[in-house]
Amino acid sequence: MVFAFLVFLVALVGAGALAVVHIARASANVVYADTWGHINMVGHFLSGRLFPAELFAPHNQNRPVVLNIILLLSAKYDHLNLIHVEYLSVIFAILTVVIIVYFCRQMFEGNYPLMFIILSVATLLMLSLSQWENFLLPINIVFFSTITFSVGSILLLHRHLLRDASNGLSVDFFGAILLSALALFSMGGGILTPVVNTIQIALSWFLFRKQVRTTIVVYVIVAGLLTFIYLKSLGQSIDYNYDLTHLAEMSQFILAGLGNSTVGFFNNASILQLDIIFGIFLSAMYVFAGVKFFRLPRPEQEQSLGVFCLLLLGIFEQMLIGLGRLHLGVGNAASSRYATLTMISVVAALILLSTYTRGSRIYAALAILLGGGICSFAILADYEEAKMETARMQYAQNLQRILRGGQITEADKANLEWDNLEDIVSGNEVLKQHGLSLYDEKSNPSR
């Protein structure tokens, strides 16, 4: 057990350190892309003119309250050092791994060597640089926070449902509600956390005859209210007519997205066909894991319900991404930002398959096959992304030069990745006025 634990510790610390080093080598303290949509709010806050409603303002069909709070705190206490915000993304990823370890240890029934080896593989995936876009764009911290809060909520609710008196309310239950709210107000993908939790409560009643009337009534009411607040005046981002008339493309999009959660980029580009092929393989693993779950003895099934719901979460996230992004083309499924939301299914399937291995060579072989695929692609993704560090740093430093030059033109919008020139110009003035981000002397002493 000691050796297996050391392997896990090395994987966790090593993968986390690699992500931190990659950020330090590939990113600069500069505002670009969707971050521009939040800078005027930061200026209002520092000038004492912030309206509370601005925290809840829609942004790209999301209501990122958690992100807004992080940016305001960073501006107040850290001069909006966006590199540090990116480091916080790594902390969220590590926290997700720790949550899974803590809540899933009972599933392995004392087989700690197996548990630590399996979770070492999962760690390599969850901290893989296949998510480079989320590690290197500060506001994409919402992808990591959404998954952290969602996983915590689902597993807390599972522990509540394991109690003999699960019809009552507990600290775990209220913790699950709180984390559901944080996931929801991180980004749009968090809307699936209440959905999965409701399914979890319903399965607990249907499979185990748990008395969950109070639990489901209170949860649905609170989650429904939070969802209503979130969706109010948000605007529709899903073209259902288009999606329903392009079902073949939708299936390709979903398969490519599932595969993309593990495969990563090669020479700074995705290989769509490889994503689809691996997506088919992962889909088969999910089917094996799901079918076996419903055939488990009741005690094992009850212990595994939380992880089974994590499997559903990642699949549902990919389906939601497909509904909202299919009109952009099947290739959009291979965007590295989405991998953070969907890889939780891969981790859940690996855990489930590994716990099925007792007395079953078939599931042992499937677990080894899946684990081997995860390790191979995680290592390749890290290697491929490490080759891009110099180019990405040069790109970020070029953005700094554009902003410091002061004469920002229409032609610069493409480089700064934001369509509204007024946002960029006014935001740049906010940064200058308050000494934020690239204009902070302490974090940019060489400028």
Identify the function of each model-found stretch:
Residues V2-V66, L71, A75-L119, S170, ...:
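Intrinsically disordered, polar/acidic, low-complexity terminal segments
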Residues A28-G48, L137-N140, Y230-G257, G306, ...:
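Extracytoplasmic catalytic-loop and juxtamembrane helix elements of membrane-embedded
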Residues F116-T148:
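Aromatic- and kink-enriched transmembrane "portal" helix at the membrane-lumen/periplasm boundary
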Residues I117-M126, V220-F228, R298-R325:
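Transmembrane alpha-helix segments characteristic
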Residues V121, N140-A165, S345-A348:
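Specific aromatic-rich, kink-prone transmembrane helix
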Residues F135, V142-S145, G331-L353:
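Hydrophobic/aromatic-rich transmembrane helices and adjacent perimembrane loops
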Residues S170-I199:
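Membrane-interface alpha helices of multi-pass inner-membrane proteins
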Residues I191-F208, G224-T227, L353, R358:
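Hydrophobic transmembrane alpha-helices of multi-pass, membrane-embedded glycosylation machinery
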